Design a protein with these regions (language model features):
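Short amphipathic alpha-helix with an adjacent loop that forms part of the alpha/beta core around
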Residues: 132-144
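Periplasmic-binding protein-like
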Residues: 145-152, 172
Length: 173
């Protein structure tokens, strides 16, 4: 579940700057309590201008996308990101986070969902049911590959994703 609240106590290895801050937290149980314990790695600051109610309505999909693209991948404006299963919950959240970051967005999705993703501003959409996307990404990026892969696939699709990743690129899942 999700919770919004003010940090009132910290564990031993937690950044002290979080104390007193309002955060959105992903927690497994107990979000309807007056106090909860949350992993600091699964907390993000409540954005300026966002109410607690708005923050609490964000889904785990958005927290996953924010944490993955901002905290882990450190996505920068102008970088290219490949979002697998971009029509799904985490994929849609990642698409919005990446767009807000100013990244160039490539995606995979099933054929019936590809047109909708193009309307959302995705530059290229590839078939998620074929590993041909790796070669297509390399062609589109003129052999460079993407800076970030947001992965939700398995098996040979993971290997293909690594082939589509630029030198020094980041793979998150």
């Amino acid at each position: 579940g999700e919770a919004v609240g003010r940090v009132v106590a910290l564990g031993a290895d937690v950044n002290p700057s979080l104390l007193g801050k309002k955060v959105i937290a992903a927690i497994t149980i107990g979000s309807l309590a007056s106090h909860v314990v949350a992993n600091s790695e699964l907390c993000i600051p409540l954005p300026d201008g966002m109410t607690a109610e708005e923050g609490a309505s964000l889904s785990t999909a958005f927290l996953t996308a924010l944490y993955g693209l901002n905290s882990l991948a450190n996505l920068k404006p102008g970088e290219t990101v490949l979002i697998h299963a971009a029509a799904g919950g985490v994929g849609q959240a990642a698409l919005q986070v990446a767009k807000r970051s100013g990244a160039k967005i490539l995606a995979t999705a099933s054929t019936p969902k590809q047109a909708a993703l193009l309307k959302q501003g995705v530059e290229q959409v590839y078939d998620s049911r074929s590993i041909d996307f790796a070669d297509q990404v390399l062609t589109y990026t003129e052999g460079r590959g993407v800076d970030v892969v947001v992965n939700s696939l398995k098996g040979e699709w993971v290997d293909a994703s690594f082939r589509a990743l630029a030198n020094g690129g980041r793979f998150i899942e």
